[in-house]
C-alpha cells in the first residue's frame, strides 16, 4: 500500500495490519470517534482509507523527517501530509512556521472544499 516499491513483497506491513485491527475493534465496539495517527506522510498512508462525513483531520507541525520518501522540502512534506484532508470535511492545521507550507495546505483544503 504505502510506498510498496520499497518492500520486497506485497504482504501488508505491520503498521497496515495493526491499523486494520484497530478499525475492526472500533467497529465491533461501536466507537463513536477514534483517534487515528498516520504512519508516514498521510496521502498514501493506510489510515487514509477511513471515509466518514464527520472526519476531522489535524495536521501538526511539520519537520524534515522521512525526506527519502516524502520529499526534501517542507512544502513537499506539507503536500503529503495534506493528503489526509477529507473532501467536504474539516481540517485543523497548527500554525505553520512558513507561509509556503500554509499555502500548500490551504490550496488542498480549498480543492476539497474543506
Question: Which positions does each model-derived feature cover?
Answer:
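Acidic, Mg2+-coordinating active-site environments of NTP-dependent enzymes
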Residues: 30-37, 54-114
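ATP-dependent carboxylate-amine ligase catalytic core
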Residues: 1-51, 68-70
Amino acid at each position: 500500500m504505502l510506498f510498496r516499491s520499497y518492500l520486497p513483497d506485497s504482504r501488508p506491513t505491520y503498521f497496515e495490519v495493526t491499523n486494520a485491527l484497530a478499525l475492526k475493534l472500533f467497529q465491533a465496539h461501536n466507537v463513536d470517534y477514534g483517534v487515528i495517527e498516520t504512519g508516514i506522510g498521510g496521502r498514501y498512508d493506510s489510515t487514509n482509507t477511513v471515509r466518514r462525513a464527520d472526519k476531522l483531520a489535524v495536521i501538526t507541525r511539520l519537520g524534515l523527517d522521512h525526506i527519502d520518501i516524502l520529499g526534501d522540502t517542507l512544502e513537499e512534506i506539507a503536500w503529503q501530509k495534506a493528503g489526509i484532508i477529507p473532501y467536504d470535511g474539516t481540517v485543523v492545521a497548527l500554525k505553520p512556521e512558513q507561509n509556503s507550507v500554509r499555502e500548500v495546505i490551504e490550496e488542498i483544503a480549498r480543492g476539497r472544499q474543506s
